[in-house]
Regions:
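Conserved class I S-adenosyl-L-methionine
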Residues: 17-27, 121-144
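A short acidic, Gly/Pro-enriched loop at the edge of an enzyme's catalytic core
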Residues: 76-84
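A short glycine-rich, Lys/Arg-flanked "PGG" loop and its adjoining helix->strand segment in the class I
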Residues: 101-119
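Short alpha-helix
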Residues: 155-173
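Conserved SAM/SAH-binding beta-strand->alpha-helix loop
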Residues: 48-50
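Conserved SAM-binding strand-loop segment of SAM-dependent methyltransferases
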Residues: 61-72
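Conserved SAM-binding loop of SAM-dependent methyltransferases across substrates and taxa
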Residues: 28-39
Length: 175
């Protein structure tokens, strides 16, 4: 959560100074600083007050950053953004989003914060990654073959294949 290398996930992306970014699940700010360097305005939302405080101290010199603490599902930001960044959060949506379709509901909410030309950037482990077929434990549960076997009995975390993500995205109202 503290390595500067984590910023590599987005430091290559062509975000411009004229862009606004909504970062969901900012954590301790591993990519927040990079987003602030690239975009004109960054709003970071974090569920944990402790992590939000770490993010603040890590990025306190950034004058284009607003940090908010709470569940985005309970917030109305009253603004739309050029980018919504969801990095390492979607897999936990059933923990903080109510209803029978938490992933679709969560992504639908993210879509409501995008401008008409805005982009949703999602980073999540690939449920069908080769390492899992080779016996590596699932990243969140530390149980081998757990994800590729459909997370039997698990109701707190879930990753997806590309095809599954595309279906969730479509059901959420994205093209």
């Amino acid at each position: 959560h503290f390595s500067d290398l984590r910023a590599n996930i987005l430091n290559w992306y062509p975000i411009k100074k004229s862009d606004s970014v909504l970062e969901i699940g900012a954590g301790c700010g591993a990519i927040t600083g990079t987003l602030c360097e690239k975009a004109g305005q960054v709003t970071s939302v974090e569920l944990s007050k402790r992590r939000a405080q770490i993010n603040y101290y890590r990025n306190e010199k950034k004058n284009n950053l607003t940090i908010m603490v709470g569940n985005l599902n309970d917030m109305d930001l009253g603004q739309q953004y050029d980018y919504v960044v969801v990095n390492g959060v979607l897999e936990y949506a059933m923990s903080f989003t109510e209803g029978d379709t938490p992933y679709e509901t969560f992504l639908g909410k993210m879509g409501s914060y995008l401008k008409n030309t805005g982009k949703l950037l999602i980073a999540i482990e690939n449920k069908l990654g080769m390492k899992y077929f080779a016996g590596a434990p699932e990243d969140h549960t530390d149980i081998p073959f757990f994800g590729i076997n459909g997370y039997p009995g698990n109701h707190s975390v879930r990753t997806f294949s590309k095809t599954e993500l595309q279906k969730i995205k479509k059901k959420s109202g994205f093209p």
